[in-house]
Amino acid sequence: MAAISQPVIVIGAGLAGTEAAWQIAEAGVPVILYEMRPQRQSPAHHSESFAELVCSNSFGAMASDRAAGLLHEELRRLGSLVFSKASEHQVPAGGALAVDRALFSEDLTRTVADHPLVEIRREELRSLPTEGIVVLCTGPLTSPDLAEDLQRFTGQDYCSFFDAASPIVTGESIDQAIAFRASRYDKGEAAYLNCPLNRDQYLAFREALVTAEQAELKDFEQESAKFFEGCLPIEELARRGEDTMRYGPLKPVGLFDARLGDWRDPENRSRRPYAIVQLRQEDRAGNLWNLVGFQTNLRWGEQKRIFQMIPGLSQAEFVRFGVMHRNTFVNAPQLLDASLQFRQRPTLLAAGQLIGTEGYSAAVAGGWLAGTNAARLALGRSPLVLPDTLVSGSLFRFISSAEPKYFQPMPPNFGILPNLEQPPRNKKDRYAAYRDRALQDLRDWQQTHAIGNLSPSTGLATTAIA
């Protein structure tokens, strides 16, 4: 085993950086974790805690026959710190994994800071360290000086898109004589509050969104803004067509107020909602609720006026209004290998949204792999590549091999997995087959490299460097 001459440097304590720093330290390698907050705040963050969830508080579906849920299970078996803490701070969200974002981030901050091999430096790095092993996890809001230095290093302009966050309201301000608790098709707990709209209410709400005054974008004109399709502002959906929202975040199917009786009763057919606004619990106490799918760039006064048009929210008290910010990412297919190393400098690794993976879970997965490989490099070992039959492995294969000219951020999904040899015709069976293949291949890979948990969902494991 090689002698460790200097600590690994991790830049950025978001989801990816927090996971990376932990994996490095757990492998017995000292690490210095740089975080510029609170010395310098980003446009989207509200605290100085590590792994702050700046958009939703949900990591997506938990079921392992869904891409998001399968990625969760992969990360649990790999010994992810972030997913261990997500389970500890889970709040009701039907079939989704949602967390109390404040408790989750504060716990992660304490846990990482208390590790004897982790040194925290609350300062901004304005340029890439030129020596040693470095893991870059600065996210889509990388500070201007560091972004300029990275641009100089890669010789490339950044790609970019606009991202947005949803408003949060207090639970006591929601009229629960109108809003009702339910999960779609009664799956899981009745964890969502649902605000029903009839046709007239929906059309008036859509008209208000289409004609509302938007906040001015700082980076360039609104007309040239590109949005990530998985996180479109609600007003953008409204502009795309009369029914677009009803087939998206305001989809009413599978939801009915049980106080009115059975939705299947003939007399209740006319009482089915034309559209539904869902609110998801933000904290364990149920004091805060997030408007699901209501990312927005409306001015704050307009948000209050228009969102209070929603039945049940006429007296809503907003603790956070929706915000929009520009996300930048590098053209990963031209720069990175599937090990998340830069080809022109293998001791520089990167993870998170900066490399074009989309979503919280993907950032954690990238942090896990980049951190694991940084530790292996420090110990004189060869870096690893995850099997591409895994959701995580397929994602990193995609971002390292896609067509650079058309590269856009990619979320976890089954569409980028290798084809099954004998795919079932039924979609549910096909997704289950993807899951079974992935978990078997992960188990084989773990046994080969002596890494992580070999049994499902057993919490933390010590990273092994074999």
From Swiss-Prot:
InterPro entries: FAD/NAD-bd_sf, MnmG-rel, MnmG_N, TrmFO. It is an enzyme of class 2 (transferase). It comes from Synechococcus elongatus (strain ATCC 33912 / PCC 7942 / FACHB-805) (Anacystis nidulans R2). One of its GO terms (molecular function) is tRNA (uracil(54)-C5)-methyltransferase activity, 5,10-methylenetetrahydrofolate-dependent. It comes from the Bacteria. It holds the Pfam family GIDA. Its EC number is 2.1.1.74. This is Methylenetetrahydrofolate--tRNA-(uracil-5-)-methyltransferase TrmFO. Catalyzes the folate-dependent formation of 5-methyl-uridine at position 54 (M-5-U54) in all tRNAs. Signal peptide: none annotated. Belongs to the MnmG family. TrmFO subfamily. Disulfide bonds: none annotated. Its cofactor is FAD. Keywords: Cytoplasm, FAD, Flavoprotein, Methyltransferase, NAD, NADP, Transferase, tRNA processing. It is found in: Cytoplasm. One of its GO terms (cellular component) is cytosol. Its main location: cytoplasm. GO terms for biological process: tRNA methylation; tRNA wobble uridine modification. The gene is trmFO.
